[in-house]
Amino acid sequence: MSRKTVFPKVMCTQHPDSASKYIATQEEPGEAIEAAQIFGCDEYMPDYEGKATPYHQNVQVVSKFIEETDLIPGKDIIITPRAPSAVQENQFRQLMVMMSIAEANYNALEYSDVQAINEFVHPMTDSVREIIGAQQHMVDVSELAKKEFGFSMEVPCIIPLIEDAPALLHAKELAENTLFAWKGHFGTVPDKFRVFLGKSDSALSFGHVASTLSCKYAINGICELNSELDTQTGIIFGAGTLPFRGHLDLMNAENFFKEYRGVGTITLQSALRYSHKKGDAESLVKLAKARLPETPELFSAEEKEEIINLIGIFGASYSRIIRQLAPTINRIADLLPQQRDRLMHKGTGGYSRSAPDISGLVNLCRTDIGKELEASMPAEDLQLPRAIKFTGALYSIGLPPEFIGTGRALEEAREKLGEAACENLLTKYFPSLAGDLNFASEYLDLNVASRFLSSECLKEVSKDLDILHGAFALETSPEPSYRILVEMMQPDLLQAGSRGNCMDEEVSQLVCSTLTKMGKIRKALG
């Protein structure tokens, strides 16, 4: 089999992380054109996961490229929708998106013999059964299109999106077992297969360090598959601009490309396009096209074991604090602006993120570390907001989540795994950690954060910061205008402005305006 398949390098997405711009669904087809013609992206992702995206957006995007540009969808610009999860949302919405993929391909056939849409993303993937089931739905829709309209298309191939730390640690096995199951179920295997890895949700559940290590472990494993299987595998890496969500921006590009070697495609999210300096997004796209993919440094069996135990230690230290902060996070997240048309947070039409099944991680950790990780997890789902608002909420009270649990975990790792393991963490496994913490320290204000923390929580966070100051010589000096805004954050003010209270409209507007201004200064909502 030829190994010359070139995967797209930059996928433009509809993530609602811009602090400066709201984009309605009817504007998104135009955004797709802008992504290709202005920013230089070679892939665009119409997003139906948790969003009120209309059925016909896939058709609109494909038609707009055909009618208004010289770019051929499926050749010059790759269109890759993200369908909803049949488990987390409902199967009807998933089938709706698949029907719209078929319709978009049918309409495009009139203008080109190139199929417009050839892949689709499946979110929050946990199992081979889920992947094969969704792929079978796509086969069924393709057969229905042939039966009803006499229209034959190549069945679009699923891209599983893996988003929590335990699943990321089993990404290689999931991809490998999927391809074996594919052969058994469909009688053949695809000659190329992409896997989408998400940084944000694993960070939300396990913290910044555990999330980064989990993603790198997954990248490492999937890269190993390329030398073991006939199917060529590619990796899409979903990252935002703030460190907690990946730290993908022009200023940090060199660190990012070194940190995540092996990734073939990056996401260009809304914050970088609309909230960063004009020209930054275009420059990053050019850089990514020149650099990706870079050869990964593969880990040894001993290093993998060490990484897993580090993930367990950092995840436990983070989780013990975050469960205490959940009410505050939810209250602030409720007041952050909605920058895309999302489905309702609760009920049958939408969903929030719930706690992952950690058994797959606990079983890999050393026994004592696994037990502490289990003990750190909340007894029931916290129903936290989505990752962007989660991150924005913590930044808005002067406590960037990158710091939570990190100092204490570093000390614990030194005690339990030894000095060499900590040295490996800082020089080999996660060399960008110092840079990430220095960036986040510009938005750290413990005096303000202390207003929202219990005495126990404040004690633990203060210890985190003391250890990190000693280890990294951090300079915690918030930008002056940001300091003024964050000083305005008072628990009573938030309570007055939160939804569900009889609020004064001016107070509510003041709180929302302040939160938005802080987002603009840090160049991302979250």
From Swiss-Prot:
Keyword Ribosomal protein tagged: no
Listed cofactors: Mg(2+)
Pfam families recorded: PEPcase_2
Keywords: Carbon dioxide fixation, Lyase, Magnesium
Keyword Membrane assigned: no
Catalytic activity: oxaloacetate + phosphate = phosphoenolpyruvate + hydrogencarbonate
EC id: 4.1.1.31
Molecular function GO labels: magnesium ion binding; phosphoenolpyruvate carboxylase activity
Role noted for this protein: Catalyzes the irreversible beta-carboxylation of phosphoenolpyruvate (PEP) to form oxaloacetate (OAA), a four-carbon dicarboxylic acid source for the tricarboxylic acid cycle.
Subunit structure: Homotetramer.
Name by which UniProt lists this protein: Phosphoenolpyruvate carboxylase
Protein's organism: Methanosarcina barkeri (strain Fusaro / DSM 804)
Lineage of origin: Archaea, Methanobacteriati, Methanobacteriota, Stenosarchaea group, Methanomicrobia
Gene behind the chain: ppcA
